[in-house]
Amino acid sequence: MGGINVIEIEIVPDHESASARVAGFIVEQIRRKPASVLGLATGGTPERTYELLVEKVNAGHLSFSQATTFNLDEYVGLLPDHPQSYHAYMRFRLFGETDFDAERTHLPKGTADELSDAGGQYEALIAEAGGIDLQLLGLGANGHIGFNEPGATEDSRTRVVDLTEETIAANARFFDSPEDVPRRALTMGIATILEAREIVLIATGESKAEAVERSVRGPVAPQMPASFLQQHPSVTFVLDEAAASLLDKRA
């Protein structure tokens, strides 16, 4: 890695189409390798993707029983049963609704006694599982992937980070008030993400258009964390027309 690669761009009409396409990537991966290691994301964007996967499992068309998962991040200080924790998000939207083996679903421990050790322990678990086959990403309006905020470095690993005011404001809709949003999170690093064998990023809506354009066409720089994806040999951005609106579609 380190060279610049062409990010594959798929543009679809709307969020529903994007969600279906990303669900298709995951279905294809599991059918190709039932014991796949999946990297998973949270937030509003992938919710419909997870709903579609639940429908496929419940219809008998898909099984996650042999799969292993690693989520990108978790808030620091929220217990796993806190309704806004990402443990609860995944349990409610995917894990508890399908046939995933709970022993093989992993999220960073934001309540670990020794947070300084939690990142290294998470990295070790990923390595022990053989690395991530397919990593799902969302995209923040400021270009963050996971909770790697602007300024994140290419060599960063799973660690505790401070959230920007922009990210706190964006996530406030999930909490009773902005004051309730945690100020720190435990997140996979840029280097961790780039070690996945394949990466699929979903971005929808006009609010993501500038970050998409800078990630795909702009220089690779810490101030636009998703731009580091240009250095990965197998990345696909699945975009709706609004998120792709600033791209030259002939490129």
Swiss-Prot record:
UniProt keyword terms in alphabetical order: Carbohydrate metabolism, Hydrolase
The EC number(s) given in the record are 3.5.99.6
The residues annotated as the active site are 73, 142, 144, 149
Which InterPro entries does its entry note?
A: Glc/Gal-6P_isomerase (IPR006148), Glucosamine6P_isomerase (IPR004547), Glucosamine6P_isomerase_CS (IPR018321), NagB/RpiA_transferase-like (IPR037171)
Enzyme class, top EC level, equals hydrolase
Q: Name one GO biological process term.
A: N-acetylglucosamine catabolic process
Q: What metabolic or biological pathway is this protein involved in?
A: Amino-sugar metabolism; N-acetylneuraminate degradation; D-fructose 6-phosphate from N-acetylneuraminate: step 5/5
Membrane spanning stretches: none
Q: Which GO terms describe its cellular component?
A: cytoplasm
Q: Does the keyword Nucleotide-binding apply?
A: no
Database matches in CDD domains: GlcN6P_deaminase
What reaction does this catalyse? alpha-D-glucosamine 6-phosphate + H2O = beta-D-fructose 6-phosphate + NH4(+)
HAMAP family assigned:
GlcN6P_deamin
As for what it does, the entry says: Catalyzes the reversible isomerization-deamination of glucosamine 6-phosphate (GlcN6P) to form fructose 6-phosphate (Fru6P) and ammonium ion.
- This protein is called Glucosamine-6-phosphate deaminase
Which organism does this record belong to? Rhodopirellula baltica (strain DSM 10527 / NCIMB 13988 / SH1)
